[in-house]
């Protein structure tokens, strides 16, 4: 009786997590390889592929299997469409690796780390997808970084390519504090899947300190960080920006923050008039942080809350999606 109850509980946990993962993938017209799905299950759900497939097939979810992936619904994208999204993501990643150091030369030292998140980090991109960035600045550098980045992008970024969106920029103390608290399964996956462009050691150290991420997705955590050596840098105690630059950062803050809020209001007004409610977003501007959070991503977070092992503390967000790009 006890073994049966335990097995039923594990089935329920597995199914709840799988439903959330597949539902989120469906939001982006995508699916999941069963092996990748296994890597996203919590501890205690030790499934092999045949057991997982059997559980999914008797779950009642409308599922389709195509190209080695499982999809929600009866009309999965064709193999050609899947390959096209994967190829576009690789092209965008190659472009970002080439262009970011060139365009932001002289700006990157303001940061502790810079990573790509969103669809590109997951290896699939559509024609309309932006490139989402998550940046952690040195103390006193958030608004200076944003200002210099927007200027550099306007002047130096002359080659065609996907839109760059610096959707979350946090001062390092804010990032350390935020990543130390449980943010739920969806955020754990987003944070782990981020692809580092600058300050990789720093970012790895942050993740190694975030034990809640390991508890939430142990297999993926081990796959991403299990062989990583102890980083040579600490996520705390780094030198702040020199005081003249901190003063400039403070002077820029009220003007650039106001500008971004106005841009956000204008964009949202246009989205409402055009019947594009899913593209609405919030603009969060504080002295030590700036975030854009889309309504679509808020819904994804809510979808994933029931799949979290540790109840999330989502008073603030690690990152946003698809905010405005003032450099365009």
Name what the model sees in each region.
Residues 2-12:
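Intrinsically disordered, low-complexity serine/threonine- and proline-rich regulatory segments
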Residues 12-113, 117-128, 137-328:
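Catalytic core of pol beta-like nucleotidyltransferases
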């Amino acid at each position: 009786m006890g073994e049966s109850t335990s097995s039923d509980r594990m089935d329920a946990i597995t199914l709840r997590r799988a439903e959330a993962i597949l539902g989120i993938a469906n939001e982006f017209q995508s699916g999941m390889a069963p092996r990748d799905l296994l890597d996203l299950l919590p501890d205690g759900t030790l499934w092999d592929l045949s057991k997982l497939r059997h559980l999914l097939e008797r779950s009642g979810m409308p599922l389709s299997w195509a190209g080695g992936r499982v999809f929600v619904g009866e009309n999965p994208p064709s193999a050609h469409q899947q390959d096209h999204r994967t190829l576009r993501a690789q092209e965008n990643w190659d472009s970002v690796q080439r262009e970011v150091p060139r365009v932001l030369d002289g700006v990157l030292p303001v940061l502790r780390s810079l990573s790509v998140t969103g669809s590109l980090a997951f290896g699939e991109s559509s024609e309309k997808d932006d490139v989402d960035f998550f940046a952690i600045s040195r103390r006193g550098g958030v608004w200076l970084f944003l200002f210099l980045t927007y200027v550099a992008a306007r002047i130096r970024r002359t080659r065609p390519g996907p839109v760059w969106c610096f959707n979350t920029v946090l001062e390092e103390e804010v990032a350390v504090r935020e990543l130390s608290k449980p943010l739920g399964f969806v955020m754990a996956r987003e944070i782990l899947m981020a692809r580092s462009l600058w300050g990789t050691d720093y970012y790895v150290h942050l993740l190694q300190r975030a034990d809640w991420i390991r508890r939430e997705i142990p297999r993926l955590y081990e796959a991403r960080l299990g062989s990583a050596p102890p980083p040579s840098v600490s996520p705390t105690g780094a030198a702040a920006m020199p005081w003249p630059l901190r003063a400039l950062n403070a002077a820029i803050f009220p003007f650039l923050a106001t500008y971004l809020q106005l841009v956000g209001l204008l964009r949202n007004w246009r989205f409402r008039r055009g019947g594009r409610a899913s593209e609405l977003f919030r603009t969060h501007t504080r002295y030590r942080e700036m975030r854009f959070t889309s309504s679509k991503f808020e819904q994804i977070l809510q979808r994933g809350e029931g799949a979290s092992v540790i109840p999330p503390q989502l008073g603030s967000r690690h990152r946003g999606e698809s905010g405005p790009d003032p450099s365009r």
